[in-house]
């Protein structure tokens, strides 16, 4: 029996709805958030599969979709020497159940996804920032987060403290909207006339 058939049989046995998806040459499945934990647990505890290692957990933002956030779990079976990708999708105001009860390494991954995207994981109450500063506003990997951010951090020599100030750009913001890296824009930017 193929690996795909074993996984689909395991999901059907537990009444878990999964959909196979294509992610290059990798074996991958899409699952709704309410089926995520039962599916991860079944994959880990199955004697045939033994997907016991969570190698990565990350998020992506697709603001044009109703469920804009994609959360991806990469699993490894040392027994089979196979990898498996599990994807789930949530909207901005939904949360995902935390997988901390299944994989010990999940806490830091979930903190990173929360820090970068603002995706909440039910059952993980540790909302401390892990990559950004504690006073940081927003979630920087969201597509609607401004490129320059909201504040800049500087060390103030007079007060001998870190100071948060509004962003002040010393140069004018330029729009790079080339249709291709091989074509120049059709308009003239200030200063370009000197090159002619």
From Swiss-Prot:
NCBIfam families: NuoC_fam, PRK06074.1-3, PRK06074.1-5. It comes from Rickettsia bellii (strain RML369-C). The keyword Protein transport does not apply. It holds the Pfam family Complex1_30kDa. It is an enzyme of class 7 (translocase). Its main location: membrane. The keyword Metal-binding does not apply. Belongs to the complex I 30 kDa subunit family. PANTHER family: NADH DEHYDROGENASE [UBIQUINONE] IRON-SULFUR PROTEIN 3, MITOCHONDRIAL, NADH DEHYDROGENASE UBIQUINONE IRON-SULFUR PROTEIN 3. InterPro entries: NADH_DH_suC (IPR010218), NADH_quin_OxRdtase_su_C/D-like (IPR037232), NADH_UbQ_OxRdtase_30kDa_su (IPR001268). This is NADH-quinone oxidoreductase subunit C. Its EC number is 7.1.1.-. GO terms for cellular component: plasma membrane. NDH-1 shuttles electrons from NADH, via FMN and iron-sulfur (Fe-S) centers, to quinones in the respiratory chain. The immediate electron acceptor for the enzyme in this species is believed to be ubiquinone. Couples the redox reaction to proton translocation (for every two electrons transferred, four hydrogen ions are translocated across the cytoplasmic membrane), and thus conserves the redox energy in a proton gradient. It is found in: Cell inner membrane. NDH-1 is composed of 14 different subunits. Subunits NuoB, C, D, E, F, and G constitute the peripheral sector of the complex. GO terms for molecular function: NADH dehydrogenase (ubiquinone) activity; NADH:ubiquinone reductase (non-electrogenic) activity; quinone binding.
């Amino acid at each position: 029996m193929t690996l795909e058939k074993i996984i689909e049989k395991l999901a059907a046995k537990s009444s878990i709805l999964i959909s196979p998806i294509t992610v290059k040459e990798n074996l991958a499945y899409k699952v709704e958030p309410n089926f995520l934990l039962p599916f991860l647990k079944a994959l880990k505890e199955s004697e045939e599969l033994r997907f016991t290692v969570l190698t990565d957990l990350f998020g992506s933002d697709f603001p044009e979709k109703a469920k804009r956030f994609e959360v991806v779990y990469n699993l490894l079976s040392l027994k089979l020497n196979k990898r498996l990708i599990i994807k789930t999708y949530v909207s901005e105001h939904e949360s995902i159940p935390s997988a901390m009860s299944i994989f010990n390494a999940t806490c830091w991954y979930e903190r990173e996804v929360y820090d970068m995207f603002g995706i909440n994981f039910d059952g993980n109450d540790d909302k401390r920032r892990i990559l950004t500063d504690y006073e940081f506003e927003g979630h920087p990997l969201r597509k609607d987060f401004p490129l320059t951010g909201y504040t800049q951090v500087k060390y103030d020599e007079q007060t001998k403290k870190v100071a948060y100030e509004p962003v002040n750009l010393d140069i004018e913001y330029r729009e790079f909207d080339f249709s291709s890296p091989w074509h120049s824009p059709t308009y003239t930017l200030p200063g370009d006339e000197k090159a002619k």
